């Protein structure tokens, strides 16, 4: 399979405790909250423009890199897999990628090429970062690049078909049309 390259727009820099979130209505990145606990984001975290995931937000992506990037920075990213999870009852996919313009990452093309410890950092972060908010996050599993690409294509289509809806309208409609993606 050819490399799966996409541009990811950074919302949250590596090591930040600030939860920024892209606001599709205004096109701005807003401070959503400060993380409730002692955790910080283990890698850069962003979204893929023109996609819509089942949670009503753009498709998310962790970007493995040695440096933190400022919010709104576009990072060329090579997708190496995905993480399927349920966040507060909604499917919330996280693509996993590496910075594509850093030679230190040129040999990483799939999740198994990454140090296991780095993957564990993300898994532990996602399992614990909402505990003090009394919200549940369930990790369903790691997925390969082919799965990630299919999910990306689904999210592109969801944006084309339903991007005009508000987040609440989208979720209400999808809970009826695709209840398998929701546990509420």
From Swiss-Prot:
Keyword set, alphabetical order: Cytoplasm, Hydrolase, Magnesium, Metal-binding
Q: What class of enzyme is it?
A: hydrolase
A Gene Ontology molecular function term of the record: inorganic diphosphate phosphatase activity
> Key word Nuclease present in the record?
no
Q: Where does Mg(2+) 2 bind?
A: 60
Q: Which GO terms describe its cellular component?
A: cytosol
Q: Which Pfam families match?
A: Pyrophosphatase
Q: Note the SUPFAM superfamilies from the entry.
A: Inorganic pyrophosphatase (SSF50324)
Catalysed reaction equations from the record? diphosphate + H2O = 2 phosphate + H(+)
Keyword hit for Cytoplasm: yes
**Could you give the subunit structure recorded for this chain?**
Homohexamer.
State the HAMAP family in the record. Answer: Inorganic_PPase (MF_00209)
Q: What is this protein called?
A: Inorganic pyrophosphatase
Tell me what organism the protein belongs to.
Mycoplasma genitalium (strain ATCC 33530 / DSM 19775 / NCTC 10195 / G37)
Taxonomic lineage of the native organism: Bacteria, Bacillati, Mycoplasmatota, Mycoplasmoidales, Mycoplasmoidaceae
């Amino acid at each position: 399979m050819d490399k799966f390259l996409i541009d990811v727009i950074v919302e949250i820099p590596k090591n930040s405790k600030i939860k920024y979130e892209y606001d599709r209505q205004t096109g701005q990145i807003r401070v959503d909250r400060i993380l409730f606990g002692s955790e910080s984001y283990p890698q850069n975290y962003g979204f893929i423009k023109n996609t819509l995931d089942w949670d009503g937000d753009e498709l998310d992506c962790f970007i493995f890199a040695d440096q933190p990037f400022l919010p709104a920075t576009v990072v060329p990213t090579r997708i190496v897999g995905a993480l399927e999870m349920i966040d507060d009852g909604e499917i919330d996919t996280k693509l996993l990628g590496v910075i594509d313009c850093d030679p230190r990452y040129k040999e990483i093309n799939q999740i198994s090429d990454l140090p296991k410890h780095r993957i564990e950092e993300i898994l532990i972060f996602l399992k614990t970062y909402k505990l003090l908010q009394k919200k549940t996050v369930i990790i369903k599993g790691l997925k390969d690049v082919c799965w990630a690409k299919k999910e990306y294509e689904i999210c592109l289509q969801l944006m084309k078909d339903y991007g005009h809806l508000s987040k609440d309208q989208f979720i209400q409609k999808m809970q009826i049309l695709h209840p398998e993606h929701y546990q509420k």
